[in-house]
């Protein structure tokens, strides 16, 4: 079975662990850089991107994650952290050739659920202070999901990033299955 690490320093970690189990993989909570050893993929969860970024700097994760040669899934704040820029001063991994509009859908009270397409399947996406892709900076970035005309899912190389929270939706397992099939199992 594949071991999928979940960056466990802030955010909705337990929900991702439950979702990983549903796709018959083993979740491993990543609290230190040493925990990155032996994983087949990494999930960077939603949470507060500025806080997660500062903690990644404090715990020495930035360079370690940048140098990983494994698939990475970023959800919500994870998408923000993987981007090249947000227009705000904050620590970023800068692994995806996109800029991000933080909190593009508004505040917490503006959160919503909406059915969108991901890889040819419908998924009930949960958007909580969700980001959107602002600008695509490379032809290597592929759009995998949209909310109307807004880009909410992309992939580039071995990285997938979505602006919604699949771990909070009953059918969110679709996103994890997509990641497993198109990234983890192709490794």
UniProtKB/Swiss-Prot annotation:
EC id: 4.3.3.6, 3.5.1.2
Reaction(s) this enzyme catalyzes, per UniProt: aldehydo-D-ribose 5-phosphate + D-glyceraldehyde 3-phosphate + L-glutamine = pyridoxal 5'-phosphate + L-glutamate + phosphate + 3 H2O + H(+); L-glutamine + H2O = L-glutamate + NH4(+)
Positions bound to L-glutamine: 47-49, 102, 128-129
Keyword terms: Glutamine amidotransferase, Hydrolase, Lyase, Pyridoxal phosphate
Annotated active site: 76 (nucleophile), 165 (charge relay system), 167 (charge relay system)
A GO molecular-function annotation: pyridoxal 5'-phosphate synthase (glutamine hydrolysing) activity
CDD domains per the UniProt record, alphabetical: GATase1_PB
Subunit structure, interactors included: In the presence of PdxS, forms a dodecamer of heterodimers. Only shows activity in the heterodimer.
Record's protein name: Pyridoxal 5'-phosphate synthase subunit PdxT
Annotated organism of origin: Methanococcus maripaludis (strain DSM 14266 / JCM 13030 / NBRC 101832 / S2 / LL)
Encoding gene per record: pdxT
